[in-house]
Amino acid sequence: MRVFAALLMLLVSAQDDEMKKRDAFTREFKDKAPAKRVEAVGKMHGSVEDKSIVAVARGLTDPAPEVKKATAACLETCTDSGGSAVKPLCAILTNKKEDKDLRLACAKALAKEEYKAEATDAMIQAITIDEKEKELYAFGAEVTKILGAFAGQDFGATKETPAKWQNWYKLNQAMLAKADAEKLAAWKKSAGKGK
């Protein structure tokens, strides 16, 4: 019984610490200086609460590229049990107008996600590179490695690789989406969000 009480106290303390950290982040992230916002994001590394993930993910829309990169790097260290960062990370990864390093940081963060369907689709879109976009080949090769490890598949790194991934995704999309929906429902139930 003492062990249970000690564990409960530890859990409550950790939640309280993250809430304080999140409150400080919310205040500090309003600073006009990008360096201060980067610093605020850095303090959120390792966050696990959904409210924290949602707050940090907003940094992906910051006008300063260094803040976006810091946000993606931070999200890579977080436990996003509710999948709250998936959509904003995918949006940047698939946007060819965004900086390649930022897009790669988003791919790395997505590779840590528990939710596979949307993240896999975004990575496949990111590696689908037109012949006129030769400057993206190295980026595409890096994302292909990340995608392979994330999905547990290897289709090499050739011109045919995106088509192979697209075919694989068509065959597995429903299964991935179903697994994601089940994970989300279980998370909502455990977090008291699904009634």
Describe every region a protein language model picked out:
Residues 27-35, 60-66, 94-101, 128-138, ...:
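Short coil turns that connect the paired helices of HEAT/ARM alpha-solenoid repeats
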Residues 40, 71, 106, 139-147:
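Conserved hydrophobic register position within alpha-solenoid helical repeats
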Residues 33-76:
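N-terminal, post-signal-peptide region of Sec/Tat-exported proteins
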Residues 16-27, 49-61, 80-94, 116-130, ...:
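Amphipathic alpha-helical scaffolding segments comprising HEAT/armadillo-like alpha-solenoid repeats
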Residues 45, 76, 111-112, 148:
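Structural signature of alpha-helical solenoid repeat scaffolds
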Residues 3-12:
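Sec-dependent N-terminal signal peptides
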Residues 141-166:
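Leucine-rich solenoid repeat scaffolds
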Residues 158-195:
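Pro/Ala/Gly-rich low-complexity, hydrophilic intrinsically disordered segments
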